[in-house]
Amino acid sequence: MFIIELTYVKPLEEVGKYMEEHKKFLEENYEEGIFIVSGPMVPRVGGIIIASLDSKEELEKIVNKDPFIINKVSSYKITEFLAAVTGEGLESLRES
């Protein structure tokens, strides 16, 4: 499992120009079963995406198709982790 941390590198009004395209990118990856949860940081300096995929390299290829990355309004950092413990109803996400 992975945490994708997006950090805006341009002002919010510039980021906003690509928000609809970014949302479409997110929706496509939710439909593929890759993204599990996402949302903006507070304060709004970027966003977080939790993803489930077999390899970091595959995920990097996907993230590099994000309109925020293509248009250079955001940078990203990917952190891999094992979801060893989950809340009720999320047992299917557990990894060992």
Residue ranges and their predicted role:
Residues 1-96:
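Conserved, structured core segments of small domains
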